[in-house]
Each structure stands twice: as C-alpha cells, then as structure tokens.
From Swiss-Prot:
The lineage of its organism: Bacteria, Pseudomonadati, Pseudomonadota, Gammaproteobacteria, Methylococcales. Coiled coil: none annotated. This is Glycine cleavage system H protein. GO terms for biological process: glycine decarboxylation via glycine cleavage system. The gene is gcvH. It comes from Methylococcus capsulatus (strain ATCC 33009 / NCIMB 11132 / Bath). The keyword Cell membrane does not apply.
Length: 127
C-alpha cells in the first residue's frame, strides 16, 4: 500500500481526517479509495451549515467507473467545502491527502479517538 501520512486519522470507510489549528477537521478520501475508484470526474460536496453524524454519507465522488458515498468521520457542522475541486476533481487522484473535500466543526473532538491511525488503517485496507 502507498505511503499513509501518520498525522491523519482514518475511517474504515476510507476517509481521512486532519485536525486543524482552528479546531476544525478537514476530510478527504484515502489514496486506497481513489485508486479503487479510478479517475474522478465529479464531486458532490455537502452544503456549508449542514449538520452531519459520524458515519453519515454527506458527499459523493464519481469516477469513470463508479460513484461512491463519502461519509463524515465525525458528528458536527460542515463549515467549509473545497470549491477548487469542483472544476478539478482529478486533484483528488493526484494528491489525495492534500485535496480535502470538506471541513467539519466537530461536536465532540473525542470522536477522533474512535478513528484508526495509519497502521490500523493499513491493516483494514489490505484485507
């Protein structure tokens, strides 16, 4: 499996989460997920202000061969979406750990502890 950034947390459903200095959490899809999907052609991102629950599907990524839900790894409010990806979804393929999809202001930052570290994610992704 490709290099997994150690500073991120990972959901079993192949999303990554990165805690930012302002207390928000940026969310994207893993390299494993983008490889499985292939070339992305469209992203449907959640609306800013939307409330989400951990594990809830709130975005969609579409590739030339499939569409997949993207789940929020944390409960909270969507506070930003990466509008730059609307015209360039291929950035997710090129740089999955830089191309965040949306940011959540979590209700309980402790939910981050329920997510996997890089080694834990590597184990489930290789199954």
């Amino acid at each position: 499996m490709s290099n997994l950034p150690a500073g991120l947390k990972y959901a079993k459903t192949h999303e990554w989460a990165r805690l930012e200095a302002d207390g928000t959490v940026k969310v994207g899809i893993s390299d494993h997920a983008q490889e499985a999907l292939g070339d992305l052609v469209y992203l449907e991102l959640p609306a800013v202000g939307r409330r989400v629950h951990a594990g809830e599907a709130c975005a969609v990524v579409e590739s030339v061969k499939a569409a997949a839900d993207v789940n929020s790894p944390l409960s909270g409010e969507i506070v930003a979406r990466n509008e730059a990806l609307a015209d360039a979804p291929e950035r997710v393929n090129q740089s999955p750990y830089e191309a965040w999809l949306f940011a959540v202001r979590p209700d309980d930052i402790g939910e981050m502890d329920q997510l996997l570290d890089a080694e834990g994610y590597r184990t489930i992704a290789e199954e």
